[in-house]
Amino acid sequence: MKTYKNLIYKNITLEKCKEIILKASKHKKKKKSVQKILSNIDYYSKELYTMVQNDKYAFKEVHHFEIIEYGKVRLIESSPFYPNQCLDYLFLECGLKNIILNKINYESFGNCPNKGIHKGMKHIHKELLDSKW
């Protein structure tokens, strides 16, 4: 079996960390925690880079809360923007994306382009039309 042990660390640079923070903050720029990171992006991108290079990264605790939507109680898990979401984006972009995207189902992962519910629906519809029964 092929191993991908050091694939992530070869692709990480300071510019890539800065780009990842900006990409992860898309559609979240009104949150105070995101504004704090973006106001001092050079410091946080350097900190993210050193965290990954020294293998000293630790994910923070996920916040759990409940909302009531249409009479149904839903349990929501919210991970902190820094470092959790930034590290997720970083690991996905710097090596795992090429490995994972080819192996996941269309409908199971909506975070990446050309994946998610709509692409899955088109795929299933095409499979049903092409089937012989």
Residue ranges and their predicted role:
Residues 1-46, 50:
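Non-catalytic, polymerase-adjacent accessory regions of viral genome-replication enzymes
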Residues 2-7, 92-133:
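Active-site-proximal segment of RNA-dependent polymerases
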Residues 11-27, 60-64, 93-99, 129-132:
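Short, compositionally biased low-complexity segments
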Residues 13, 51-72, 125-129:
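Reverse-transcriptase-like RNA-dependent polymerase core
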Residues 15-18, 42, 46, 84-89, ...:
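Non-catalytic, well-ordered alpha-helical scaffold segments
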Residues 23-35, 67-78, 103-107:
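Glycine-/proline-rich flexible loop or hinge segments
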Residues 32, 67, 90-91, 124:
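Mobile genetic element proteins and their domesticated derivatives, centered on retroelements
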Residues 72-105:
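Conserved pre-motif C helix in the palm subdomain of viral-like polymerases
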